[in-house]
């Protein structure tokens, strides 16, 4: 069944406020959707092809009636867009009969999410693509979209907890537990942060493996760190609800020290976190996988302009004001 020939959807980026890496092993994390988004349009075309175009410069096409395998004779563009192709193929094959499957889908992607700095651009693109393509054929609820987006994202990050896709789908501040009961955290006012992009690229896969090796070699220590991370998350959820930025900032800095112990931070990141604290931030920590990437700082509202200027003067890093937004996936 075809509902419409053209569909659009957008999904937000995210920041991890607390609990990255530990969430993979069952500890909670707190994530928030932010005011940066990926926008996807999908339309029915007559050739039985899946065509994917991105404003990052990648363009690739696949045949609908063939499920390609990742890594087998694919061009660089096809490898880059493979998770989106996989998600689209799954939606089409589950929505159409054999006759209708002779149709194809053309997908256009536009993003204002910086890539590769820990903001969940991969998850957001999967969520928006599944939503846009799915809406061509049937009305789909958010849980259906989340499940298929996470399946596609795991082709990129095999150990993904699902947190990125979940917060991108449902929006807001989420207390997230892998395979557990998740809940939204209600706040009295919007939470805003300064995100500092170090420009240092990282491999999420390599960092996840590093943490896995650390856990295997230091089981007792890892368990202690995970328990501390859980306690920090629980206290942070209370601080967010109570609108207590001083307490929240201290908890952010404690979380960063746990990540230092895991070995996923870098000297540049640690120096940046210390400078943020010395410059008046309530708290600061790396966000995402680590290995460079980005730092988030919680800064008094009246000091944000001066804070950003000082950081730019000291490090020349890109400073991005971000705000936690209550809305996640949007369909048009």
Where are these regions (language model features)?
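C-terminal nucleotide
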Residues: 2-18, 23, 31, 39-86, ...
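Short aromatic/hydrophobic contact patches that present stacked aromatics
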Residues: 118, 294-296
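DPxDG-like acidic metal-binding loop motif
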Residues: 34, 117-142
């Amino acid at each position: 069944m075809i509902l419409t020939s053209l569909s659009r959807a957008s999904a937000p980026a995210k920041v991890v406020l607390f609990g990255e890496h530990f969430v993979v092993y069952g500890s909670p994390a707190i994530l928030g959707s932010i005011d940066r988004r990926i926008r996807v349009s999908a339309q029915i075309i007559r050739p039985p092809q899946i065509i994917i175009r991105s404003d990052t410069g990648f363009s690739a096409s696949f045949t609908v009636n063939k499920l390609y395998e990742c890594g087998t004779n694919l061009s660089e563009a096809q490898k880059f867009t493979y998770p989106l192709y996989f998600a689209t193929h799954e939606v089409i094959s589950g929505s159409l009969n054999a006759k209708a499957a002779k149709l194809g889908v053309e997908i256009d992607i536009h993003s204002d999410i910086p890539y590769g700095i820990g903001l969940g651009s991969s998850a957001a693109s999967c969520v928006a693509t599944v939503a846009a393509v799915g809406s061509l054929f049937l009305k789909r609820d958010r849980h259906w979209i989340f499940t298929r987006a996470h399946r596609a994202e795991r082709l990129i990050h095999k150990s993904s907890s699902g947190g990125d896709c979940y917060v991108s789908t449902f929006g807001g501040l989420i207390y997230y537990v892998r395979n557990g009961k998740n809940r939204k955290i209600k706040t009295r006012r919007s939470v805003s942060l300064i995100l500092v992009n170090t420009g240092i690229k990282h491999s999420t896969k390599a960092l996840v493996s590093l943490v896995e090796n650390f856990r295997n070699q230091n089981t007792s220590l890892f368990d202690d760190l995970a328990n501390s991370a859980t306690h920090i998350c629980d206290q942070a959820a209370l601080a967010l609800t109570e609108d207590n930025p001083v307490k929240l900032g201290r908890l952010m800095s404690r979380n960063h020290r746990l990540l230092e112990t895991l070995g996923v931070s870098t000297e540049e990141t640690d120096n940046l976190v210390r400078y943020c604290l010395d410059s008046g931030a309530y708290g600061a920590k790396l966000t995402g996988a680590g290995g460079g990437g980005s730092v988030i700082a919680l800064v008094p509202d009246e000091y944000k302009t001066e804070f950003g200027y000082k950081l730019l003067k000291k490090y020349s890093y890109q400073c991005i004001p971000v705000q936690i937004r209550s809305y996640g996936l949007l369909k048009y």
